[in-house]
Amino acid sequence: MERKLLDLGEVQIEYFVHGSGPLVVLLPSLGRGAEDFDDVRPPLAHACCVVTPQPRGIGASRGPMSGITLHDYARDVAALIEREGGGPALICGHAFGNFVARTTATDRPDLVRGVALLGATHVWPVPPDVRESIMKSSDLSLADDERLKYLRHAFFAPASDPRVWLSGWHPEVKKAQRVATDATPQSEWWQAGTAPILDVQPESDVMCPPESQSRYRDELGDRVTIVRIPNAGHALLPEQPAAVARALLDFAARLYPAT
């Protein structure tokens, strides 16, 4: 795996490249870093060139954190794809990361072959109790036992161990990303341009209850392929990394049939 830096002037993006083949970009969840994909990346790298950027404010990535929108984060991703040959790439976004993936596909369709939604929110607005758990789960001023309660509620399947997510949080990054999301009209990114979409749904995700499972396919039609992953909640990646990798590899094989 190779570490690289992308210098865009006032913005610098640290990212990691692993493997060769079609370009696959992995974008992490709200307030979290590229390390969340550590167990997903290696199997993907057997068939793909996997790129995992650190969001602004994490690691060596830097840039304005206020007065920005999802379009600014999408520009970071687009510049990275161009730096790595222009793709077109499969962009995979986990939770918040799928907002950035969909914005990139909308703003720069020439760079995007497909979009994978990993644990995407299917209910809007997010129920107040879930939203509270999302925010408090990363509140480092709270005791671990209290944070574990919130992590279990918002992120993990009943049989999963939420302690793996006691660490890895970047509260200031999380705050900036949430503000940027609120500053971006949903209509500007919701449809992910015209790219094919893989909707990877954890079966125990509180943000994808049974009545909402077909939401994206109902709205966007045959562009959307649904894959359900058992024994996983909204966190998904630490719970079922092998299943996530398999779903992404299968989707990539459809997008890049000659490779």
Language-model-detected regions and their locations in the chain:
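Alpha/beta-hydrolase fold catalytic core
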Residues: 1-24, 46-49, 87, 156, ...
